Swiss-Prot record:
Cross-referenced Pfam families: Methyltransf_5
GO cellular component: cytoplasm
Region of interest called Disordered, as start-end residue ranges on this chain: 1-21
Organism (species): Granulibacter bethesdensis (strain ATCC BAA-1260 / CGDNIH1)
Name of protein: Ribosomal RNA small subunit methyltransferase H
Keyword set, alphabetical order: Cytoplasm, Methyltransferase, rRNA processing, S-adenosyl-L-methionine, Transferase
Gene responsible for this protein: rsmH
The protein's enzyme class: transferase
Similarity comment text for this entry: Belongs to the methyltransferase superfamily. RsmH family.
Domain of life assignment: Bacteria
Main location as per UniProt: cytoplasm
GO biological processes: rRNA base methylation
Catalytic activity entry: cytidine(1402) in 16S rRNA + S-adenosyl-L-methionine = N(4)-methylcytidine(1402) in 16S rRNA + S-adenosyl-L-homocysteine + H(+)
Task performed by this protein: Specifically methylates the N4 position of cytidine in position 1402 (C1402) of 16S rRNA.
GO terms, molecular function: rRNA (cytosine-N4-)-methyltransferase activity
Length: 334
């Protein structure tokens, strides 16, 4: 296939940037297209539609292809309506979680796919909108809800005990000073509710001094709260199993993740699906059970990372990792 050239992107998004014309440019665009290898007439799922960059590239690359685009954020679906009008009959927008992709698609008569792409995490549009409450760089309401419903980050830190806040920061943000930050949050909320991103970031920065990396001290804590608010790791694990059951032989699952927690889940799942899981001990009774032939093969032996040019153009792409598998056969039902 002919991969599209990557356009220069401004550093304005976690999972993508914007060109000088305002077009959304997703991270690892060339690499995603090359790995997905969309064929003419194929049916694909963009499970994290966002700004529509991957969807647009698939539709432009593969003649007569169809994309079903899912996003939990109503704003993303609204933005996508103009794109759907442009690709009349080829792009179908669905508001919902990618962890529900099986039911969302089967309810619409789609039972098999030629490819799936997932860009895990917060989108550039969400980060760059202060009112969504994802960023510590601009002051706004402490929200972080991707779908705009459920428990907000402000609600979370207002009601959770100190120990639970510390656990979230440590387990989901890998923040070493999680206990000190949790203690500072509980102390601050006793004086006044923490309702803005600016105040929370200030509290964290008073506990965690800046280091030589140049990474803002609030980065890990904000990541942890966002993951907790949106149950991102749970959503990912549920989505992976459904994705593999939807792919037909030759279909590929391509995933771009942005931090080590996600990448570990994806790597482990893909290795297991491809039959590359470590052999059990000969003393483990489970090892006596005959292994079935794997239904998938690894496309990426190791994670694909953005090149220097893309990292320089969009610094937020630096942590991106791409992994992919290809379906060899569909699961047969007895």
């Amino acid at each position: 296939m002919n991969a599209l050239p990557i356009r220069t992107a401004a550093p304005s998004g976690h999972s993508g940037g914007h060109s000088s014309t305002g077009t959304h440019v997703p991270v690892l665009l060339n690499e995603v297209l090359e790995t997905l290898s969309p064929a003419p007439g194929g049916v694909f799922l963009d499970g994290t539609f966002g700004g529509g960059g991957y969807t647009r590239a698939i539709l432009d690359t593969a003649e007569d292809s169809t994309v079903w685009a899912v996003d939990r954020d109503p704003a993303a679906i609204t933005r996508g309506e103009a794109l759907a009008a442009r690709y009349r009959g080829r792009l179908h927008l669905i508001q919902g979680n990618f962890s529900q992709m099986a039911s969302l698609l089967t309810d619409r008569g789609v039972n098999a796919l030629d490819g799936i792409v997932l860009d895990i995490g917060v989108s550039s549009f969400q980060i760059d909108d202060p009112d969504r409450g994802f960023s510590f760089r601009t002051d706004g309401p402490l929200d972080m809800r991707m779908a705009g419903e459920g428990t907000s980050a402000a609600d979370l830190i207002a009601r959770l005990p100190e120990a639970e806040i510390a656990n979230i920061l440590y387990e989901l943000g890998e923040e070493r000073k999680s206990r000190q930050i949790a203690r500072a949050i509980v102390s601050a909320r006793a004086e006044e509710p923490i309702t803005t991103t600016g105040r929370l970031a200030s509290i964290i920065r008073c506990v965690v001094p800046p280091d030589r990396s140049g990474i803002d001290p609030a980065t890990r804590s904000f990541q942890a709260l966002r993951i907790a608010v949106n149950d991102e790791l749970g959503e990912l694990e549920r989505a992976l199993q459904q994705a593999t059951n939807l792919l037909q032989p030759g279909g590929r699952l391509v995933i771009v993740s942005f931090h080590s927690l996600e990448d570990r889940i994806v790597k482990r799942f893909m290795n297991d699906a491809a039959g590359n899981a470590p052999s059990p001990s000969r003393y483990d009774p489970r090892g006596l059970v005959a292994r079935t032939e794997p239904r998938f093969r690894l496309i990426t032996s190791k994670a694909v990372r953005p090149g220097t040019a893309e990292q320089n153009a969009n610094p937020r792409s630096r942590s991106a990792r791409l992994r992919a598998i290809e379906c060899l056969r569909r699961e047969t039902t007895p």
